[in-house]
Amino acid sequence: MDIRPNHTIYINNMNDKIKKEELKRSLYALFSQFGHVVDIVALKTMKMRGQAFVIFKELGSSTNALRQLQGFPFYGKPMRIQYAKTDSDIISKMRGTFADKEKKKEKKKAKTVEQTATTTNKKPGQGTPNSANTQGNSTPNPQVPDYPPNYILFLNNLPEETNEMMLSMLFNQFPGFKEVRLVPGRHDIAFVEFENDGQAGAARDALQGFKITPSHAMKITYAKK
């Protein structure tokens, strides 16, 4: 029995070793090019591992995403996509539970931020060194040499299965995208061209570190002029 088209698509055959938050970010980056994504439901229970639901605002968006990304190699496995079953109470319940958990997390984060701000205000002498230390410990950027802004981006650390279509789908959601250029004989690097420096920079910032496979976080720099 065929499932009627609806706003929610069901995805399975995904790598179940990916952390939930990383999976959600990656799915959002991939699917938001087709339209407004209302929510992404990905649970790490045994029954739901390697599966997710993506809810679009428009029906046309879910239909287009299903057609374009069917079999797309995501973290090393081809995605299987279909429309979610209509009138499914399971999806509604999962969305409700997920939303409640996220709200609690946000409240906890807000309290932590307030407490940190209060502590920093009480001890101004300690605030600056701590901030400097934190920044110093969490900046991988020096490892990736960058050049002045350019309308062409240089990608490296790409997995072996990378192809032009895969990269085009990732980058064509950004304004000004022109083309992807692969390097013959090299699967790990590629160039992406935009209309201007600013548009290239926006794509660079948004997709920096995007993982096509678990072991390959994409490194993006401006191409050397």
From Swiss-Prot:
Residues 113-123 have a biased composition (Low complexity). Its main location: nucleus. The modification N6-acetyllysine is found at K111. There is a cross-link at K111 (Glycyl lysine isopeptide (Lys-Gly) (interchain with G-Cter in SUMO2)). Residues 99-145 are annotated as: Disordered. GO terms for biological process: mRNA splicing, via spliceosome; U2-type prespliceosome assembly. The keyword RNA-binding applies. GO terms for cellular component: catalytic step 2 spliceosome; cytoplasmic ribonucleoprotein granule; fibrillar center; nuclear speck; nucleoplasm; nucleus; spliceosomal complex; U1 snRNP. Changing K19Q: In a colorectal cancer sample; somatic mutation. It holds the Pfam family RRM_1. Disulfide bonds: none annotated. Residues 127-141 have a biased composition (Polar residues). It comes from the Eukaryota. GO terms for molecular function: U1 snRNA binding. Involved in pre-mRNA splicing as component of the spliceosome. Associated with sn-RNP U2, where it contributes to the binding of stem loop IV of U2 snRNA. Identified in the spliceosome B complex. Identified in the spliceosome C complex. Present in a spliceosome complex assembled in vitro, and composed of SNRPB2, HPRP8BP and CRNKL1. Contributes to the binding of stem loop IV of U2 snRNA with SNRPP1. PANTHER family: U1 SMALL NUCLEAR RIBONUCLEOPROTEIN A/U2 SMALL NUCLEAR RIBONUCLEOPROTEIN B. Patients with systemic lupus erythematosus produce antibodies which interact with snRNP proteins. This is U2 small nuclear ribonucleoprotein B''.
